[in-house]
């Protein structure tokens, strides 16, 4: 075993050499699937390589531009209309005052090295099985490395986290300091997963990352912030609490701000809190804004927080879902919903599956139903404590449970890379929720399937979703043989009785404690408590 010393990021001088990740790395770094095998390199050569990579990219861009100019001169007489549609370079867009770069999805895929990422971070990407940049990474990373503010508009599951994490870590390597970057996320689960990504990418350089979210102890969070982490990932409300109440905590020296899922941040009415947070941050900073959509609210946030940004988008088609996603409606009578769900669970046994329900109560019941019939199901919803929500996610990611039964708390932003199937057990109420639900599968270029169970009560809703999310395109039906489905009917009825009894006991137990599970709403006096439902899951 190597006796090499562990070298940490310095705050007063250039960082020391990289080391190979050891088994003692923090828990988040355990997602590394293989060790970085190349010999460590000193920071000075890393900087030199980064500059050389950027110069090489600049030379390549100049050569490409010269070739494009020659082609345009040759064909200008008879292909003027095609020239009008050509993709401008960053330099052209900047010179002409243009702030949006069209999609380059037809451009041959580059490697992370081609984008200007330094070797140690490229090795970390390889260790995490990031084989090649996704379209949003390919477009956003070079702009970020050039020092520009960036707006990224991309389909859900496109790899946005690495698109901002890699440039921030590369800048941190060049000029290390505490409290270097801040990432704001709309949900606790997304914040936790962004933190895990940063720690995994920075495992070889002893990166310190603090995740600050609601539902957890503020004192322990204050202690973590007092240790001056390099990166802070937070939900807006809890971050503002610390900015206003935690002594000695300041972000006045911050270099990078990221607002991830910005449209969701504003949908959840975080706008006033974001305004307050911005007052605590320095004006001289770099800002990245990533969003699935570009609404008027997001545009207002952009004007308030970004300086002369370049906007990149990889959503080239009008259809809102990715091309690698197979979508099927399943039309059935309402009374047979449970039977068809069990048929699907059996048909796709062994596949990682998310089953979406509309209410907390139904998520609990369906989870019990599946477990009674020996399927590895676990619930995820807003009435679980934060630790239990993260526990459910970790079990699902680790494949110790292959079915996650969730309300829309899991529909947006969760980074679960390998979800094979999404089942809409209850139809969502609008097209955007549908898009974000089915976007949990077929992420970052992978294929996936989404099956929506549609009863006689959902037809009008489905037609609206079909028109808004699919531009009216008719999807192929999922049509199982009815006799094969009804084979499960008797066993499902027995499991339904068991689920009703268990739900009744749960309600009675919670009634005694003063916290009753409800389907759509919770009373203002209801407290969030640990959910005893899944205690047997460990």
From Swiss-Prot:
Keyword set includes ATP-binding: yes
GO cellular component terms, A-Z: cytosol; nucleus
Gene Ontology biological-process entries: rRNA processing
EC numbers: 3.6.4.13
Keyword Zinc-finger listed: no
Recorded catalytic activity of this chain's protein: ATP + H2O = ADP + phosphate + H(+)
Residues at which ATP binds: 154-161
SMART domains: DEXDc, HELICc
Family that this chain belongs to: Belongs to the DEAD box helicase family. DDX47/RRP3 subfamily.
Record-given protein name: ATP-dependent rRNA helicase RRP3
Species, as recorded: Pyricularia oryzae (strain 70-15 / ATCC MYA-4617 / FGSC 8958) (Rice blast fungus)
Gene behind this protein: RRP3
């Amino acid at each position: 075993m190597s006796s090499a010393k562990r070298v940490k990021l310095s705050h007063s001088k250039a960082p020391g050499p990289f080391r190979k990740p050891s088994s003692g790395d923090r828990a988040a770094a355990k997602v590394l699937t293989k060790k970085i095998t190349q010999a460590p390199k000193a920071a000075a050569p890393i900087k030199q390589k980064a500059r050389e990579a950027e110069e090489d990219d600049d030379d390549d861009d100049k050569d490409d531009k010269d070739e494009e100019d020659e082609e345009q001169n040759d064909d200008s007489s008879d292909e003027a209309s095609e020239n009008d549609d050509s993709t401008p370079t960053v330099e052209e867009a900047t010179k002409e005052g243009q702030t949006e770069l069209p999609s380059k999805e037809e451009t041959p895929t580059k490697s992370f090295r081609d984008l200007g990422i330094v070797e140690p971070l490229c090795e970390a990407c390889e260790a995490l099985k990031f084989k090649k940049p996704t379209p949003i990474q390919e477009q956003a990373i070079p702009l970020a490395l050039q020092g520009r503010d960036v707006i990224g508009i991309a389909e859900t599951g496109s790899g946005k986290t690495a698109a901002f994490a890699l440039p921030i870590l590369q800048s941190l390597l060049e000029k290390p300091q505490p409290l270097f970057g801040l990432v704001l996320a709309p949900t606790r689960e997304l914040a936790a997963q962004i933190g895990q990504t940063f720690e995994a990418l920075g495992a070889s350089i002893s990166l310190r990352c603090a995740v600050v979210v609601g539902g957890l102890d503020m004192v322990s969070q204050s202690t973590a912030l007092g240790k001056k982490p390099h990166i802070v990932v937070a939900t807006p409300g809890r971050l503002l609490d610390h900015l206003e109440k935690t002594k000695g905590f300041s972000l006045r020296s911050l270099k990078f701000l990221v607002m991830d899922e910005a449209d969701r941040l504003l949908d959840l009415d975080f706008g006033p809190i974001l305004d307050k947070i911005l007052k605590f941050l320095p004006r001289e900073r770099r800002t990245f804004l990533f969003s699935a959509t570009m609404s008027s609210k997001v545009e207002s946030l952009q004007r308030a927080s970004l300086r002369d940004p370049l906007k990149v988008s990889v959503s080239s088609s009008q259809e809102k879902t990715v091309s690698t996603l197979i979508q099927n409606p399943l039309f059935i009578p309402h009374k047979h919903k449970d039977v068809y769900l069990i048929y699907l669970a059996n048909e796709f046994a062994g596949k990682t599956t998310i089953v979406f329900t509309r209410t907390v109560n139904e998520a609990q019941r369906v989870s019990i139903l599946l477990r009674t019939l020996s399927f590895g199901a676990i619930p995820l919803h807003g009435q679980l404590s934060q630790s239990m929500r993260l526990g459910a996610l970790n079990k699902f990611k680790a494949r110790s449970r292959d079915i996650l039964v969730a309300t829309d708390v899991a529909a947006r932003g969760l980074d679960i890379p390998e979800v094979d199937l999404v089942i809409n057990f209850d139809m969502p109420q609008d097209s955007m929720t549908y898009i974000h639900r089915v976007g949990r599968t077929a992420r970052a270029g992978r294929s996936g399937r989404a099956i929506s169970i549609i009863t006689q009560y959902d037809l009008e809703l489905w037609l609206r979703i079909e028109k808004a999310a699919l531009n009216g395109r008719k999807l192929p039906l999922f049509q199982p043989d009815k006799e094969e489905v009804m084979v499960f009917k008797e066993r499902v009825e027995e499991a339904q009785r068991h689920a009703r009894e268990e739900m009744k006991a749960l309600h009675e137990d919670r009634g005694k404690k003063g916290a009753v599970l409800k389907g759509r709403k919770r009373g203002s006096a209801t407290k969030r408590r640990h959910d005893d439902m899944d205690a047997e899951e460990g």
